[in-house]
Amino acid sequence: MYKLIKARSIVRIPPNEFGKPLNEIALNELRQQYQEKILKDLGLVLAILNVKTSEEGMLVFGDGATYHEVEFDMITYVPVVQEVVEGEVLQVDNYGVFVNLGPMDGLVHISQITDDTLKYDNVRGIIFGEKSKKVIQKGDKVRARVISVASTVTGRLPRIALTMRQPYLGKLEWITQAKK
């Protein structure tokens, strides 16, 4: 789930940046501090927007920089259990498929792809159904549901487990065929 979060912080403006527009400097400092990092309870920070920097700064003894209060928006992504997502198959292995969800990747275990008995063909890099003859391969567009999000070491992306074994989930091509 994508979130738009309003935040406040204090930004250090180094002396070599004096004379430049405050909002630009603050934006660069905030990007270095937050962007592409995972923040507890907020998720993966994708972008920093709408920076408003206070004109008045504070000085700290022994530091030539000024410190300014800033307000800004962050766009974050947090995978939520039961969320339905669409993505592209990045990799096919004997144990399942990896799906790009945008900011993160998820794994659909081979047992969670369809109700059919599935086989992996390592020569062609595909998984196919024995009875249905359904094929899934790299580049396919799929719809899946998040069934678990396992936190890993702080600062690392979580492991996302997906399923496609429910109605209206699976390869998009299979879904449109089932509707007919």
From Swiss-Prot:
Residues 82-165 form the S1 motif domain. The keyword Glycosyltransferase does not apply. Keywords: Cytoplasm, DNA-directed RNA polymerase, Nucleotidyltransferase, Transcription, Transferase. It comes from Saccharolobus shibatae (strain ATCC 51178 / DSM 5389 / JCM 8931 / NBRC 15437 / B12). It comes from the Archaea. GO terms for biological process: DNA-templated transcription initiation. HAMAP family: RNApol_arch_Rpo7. GO terms for molecular function: DNA binding; DNA-directed RNA polymerase activity. The gene is rpo7. Transmembrane segments: none annotated. InterPro entries: NA-bd_OB-fold, RNA_pol_Rpb7-like_N_sf, RNAP_E/RPC8, RNApol_Rpo7, Rpb7-like, Rpb7-like_N, S1_domain. Part of the 13-subunit RNA polymerase complex. Forms a stalk with Rpo4 that extends from the main structure. This is DNA-directed RNA polymerase subunit Rpo7. Coiled coil: none annotated. Pfam families: S1, SHS2_Rpb7-N. GO terms for cellular component: cytoplasm; DNA-directed RNA polymerase complex. Forms 2 domains with an elongated structure; Rpo4 packs into the hinge region between the 2 domains. Belongs to the eukaryotic RPB7/RPC8 RNA polymerase subunit family. Gene3D superfamilies: Nucleic acid-binding proteins, RNA polymerase Rpb7-like, N-terminal domain. It catalyses: RNA(n) + a ribonucleoside 5'-triphosphate = RNA(n+1) + diphosphate. CDD domains: RNAP_E_N (cd04331), S1_RpoE (cd04460). Its EC number is 2.7.7.6. It is found in: Cytoplasm. DNA-dependent RNA polymerase (RNAP) catalyzes the transcription of DNA into RNA using the four ribonucleoside triphosphates as substrates. The highly mobile Rpo4/Rpo7 heterodimer is conditionally required for transcription initiation. Signal peptide: none annotated.
